[in-house]
Amino acid sequence: MASSGDSSGKQRSDEEWRAVLSPEQFRILRLKGTELPGTGEYNKFYGDGVYNCAGCGTPLYKSTTKFDSGCGWPAFFEGLPGAINRTPDPDGRRVEITCAACGGHLGHVFKGEGFKTPTDERHCVNSVSIKFTPAS
């Protein structure tokens, strides 16, 4: 599977991705895998800063949009403007979210679940797909 993304120089071949990502990062970011619930580094982490794409470093989420949904994965109620693409799964049951810059698989977004957030959305994100940068 060829990587997708824009023309900002963040597109790479699978061989290039394998050289810069861990096997688990490649499985999730490039092959659209999912980490086991409750196992991710950022599931219960609430530091002040920004979450970036683990593949290309693009900022994706502010820490102020992270909340505890109890789903077993990091949850955010919105991404940074233009940072995340949404693609309905072929079965129409879920909407996949990917990094707009490199096409890396982040997880899925769910709407209308009743969470008391400004958007009533839950971006259910694999910890392996993101990297936290603390506020300075």
UniProtKB/Swiss-Prot annotation:
A GO molecular-function annotation: peptide-methionine (R)-S-oxide reductase activity
Enumerate the UniProt keywords alphabetically.
Cytoplasm, Disulfide bond, Electron transport, Metal-binding, Oxidoreductase, Redox-active center, Transport, Zinc
- The MsrB domain extends over 14-135
SS bonds (residue pairs): C71-C124
Tell me what reaction this enzyme catalyses. L-methionyl-[protein] + [thioredoxin]-disulfide + H2O = L-methionyl-(R)-S-oxide-[protein] + [thioredoxin]-dithiol
The UniProt entry lists the main location of this chain as cytoplasm
Required cofactors, per record?
A: Zn(2+)
Q: Which InterPro entries match?
A: Met_Sox_Rdtase_MsrB (IPR028427), Met_Sox_Rdtase_MsrB_dom (IPR002579), Mss4-like_sf (IPR011057)
This protein's source sits in the domain of life called Eukaryota
Extract one GO BP annotation from the record. Answer: protein repair
Q: What is its EC number?
A: 1.8.4.12
Q: Where are the transmembrane segments?
A: none
Broad enzyme group:
oxidoreductase
Coiled-coil residues are none
Q: Which Pfam families match?
A: SelR
Q: How is the cofactor bound?
A: Binds 1 zinc ion per subunit.
Could you tell me which PROSITE patterns the record lists for this protein?
MSRB (PS51790)
Might you report a single GO cellular component term?
Answer: cytoplasm
Active-site residue numbers: C124
Q: Where in the cell is it found?
A: Cytoplasm, Cytosol
Binding annotation for Zn(2+): C53, C56, C99, C102
Write out the function statement from the record: Catalyzes the reduction of methionine sulfoxide (MetSO) to methionine in proteins. Plays a protective role against oxidative stress by restoring activity to proteins that have been inactivated by methionine oxidation. MSRB family specifically reduces the MetSO R-enantiomer.
Q: Which family does it belong to?
A: Belongs to the MsrB Met sulfoxide reductase family.
* NCBIfam families found in the cross-reference section: peptide-methionine (R)-S-oxide reductase MsrB
State the protein's name. Peptide methionine sulfoxide reductase B5
Q: Which organism is it from?
A: Oryza sativa subsp. japonica
Q: What is the gene name?
A: MSRB5
